[in-house]
Amino acid sequence: MRLIIQPDYQSVSQWAAHYVAAKIKAANPTPEKPFVLGCPTGSSPLGMYKALIDLNKKGIVSFQNVVTFNMDEYVGLPKEHPESYYSFMWNNFFSHIDIKKENTNILNGNAPDLDAECARYEEKIKSYGGIDLFMGGIGPDGHIAFNEPGSSLTSRTRQKTLTTDTIIANSRFFDNDINKVPKTALTVGVGTVLSAKEVMIIVNGHNKARALYHAVEGSITQMWTISALQMHEKGIIVCDDAATEELKVGTYRYFKDIEAGHLDPESLIK
């Protein structure tokens, strides 16, 4: 696992965006062999998306031959609802870049058969040869996508009941009214994420410090699903200083030392 420690959220976002752009450019994708990108929602990736939009507008990276698969979607929320993840992606990312609409994939939380929708999603990912780079964020309890504590580390795309903590955390997007927050969601599984060729997770803020500790120094456990990233041969966590507050000093210094030559985002794009 790589741990890229940046001073603040803006630096995290810039590094993550340049890393994604570099991976897309290096793959030299074509319509026949597109680059397949896994996309998260929430507050963590917003800065990265803004930076990617800027790189796209400057002509540094193109998304014309990129196919995306989103991590999750609420069940029962109309896709046009301002807080659906469909709306989130189009408002904050897709509508600002040169991606083709038919190349974007988001789970349908209003499908008549939700189990069939999840199975279809997994099969479509496989049809592209898997995901090249899965981006993500985590919750304060270490959950990836909506894989709450206790989720199987080999799980695939399925319907999940949200924990009270997640509902409370997400209520900030629903007028701070927990009764407006959907109680279930469709989500890729931990196994789905780990099947990607590469995984990059953004962790920022003091409230994620305990989760980062479990991700880097803790044992692998279903109670902190982010800890499963330790098993991935190409896992990267990009974090800010505030998120490292529960790491051992030795761990912090180790990663700062070995990644010292890779912290400048501009150096990532050749």
Curated annotation (Swiss-Prot):
Any GO BP: glucosamine catabolic process
Entries under PROSITE patterns matching the protein: GLC_GALNAC_ISOMERASE (PS01161)
Protein name stated in the entry: Glucosamine-6-phosphate deaminase
Its EC number(s): 3.5.99.6
Alphabetized HAMAP family for the sequence: GlcN6P_deamin
Pathway terms, separated by semicolons: Amino-sugar metabolism; N-acetylneuraminate degradation; D-fructose 6-phosphate from N-acetylneuraminate: step 5/5
Annotated active site: D72 (proton acceptor), D141 (for ring-opening step), H143 (proton acceptor), E148 (for ring-opening step)
Regulation: Allosterically activated by N-acetylglucosamine 6-phosphate (GlcNAc6P).
Pfam families linked to this entry: Glucosamine_iso (PF01182)
Highest taxon of source: Bacteria
Keyword Hydrolase: yes
GO molecular function: glucosamine-6-phosphate deaminase activity; identical protein binding
Keywords for the protein's UniProt record, in alphabetical order: Allosteric enzyme, Carbohydrate metabolism, Hydrolase
Gene Ontology CC terms, in alphabetical order: cytoplasm
Family, per entry: Belongs to the glucosamine/galactosamine-6-phosphate isomerase family. NagB subfamily.
Any coiled-coil regions, as ranges: none
Record's catalysed reaction(s): alpha-D-glucosamine 6-phosphate + H2O = beta-D-fructose 6-phosphate + NH4(+)
SUPFAM superfamilies per UniProt: NagB/RpiA/CoA transferase-like
UniProt site (Part of the allosteric site): S151, R158, K160, T161, Y254
Purpose: Catalyzes the reversible isomerization-deamination of glucosamine 6-phosphate (GlcN6P) to form fructose 6-phosphate (Fru6P) and ammonium ion.
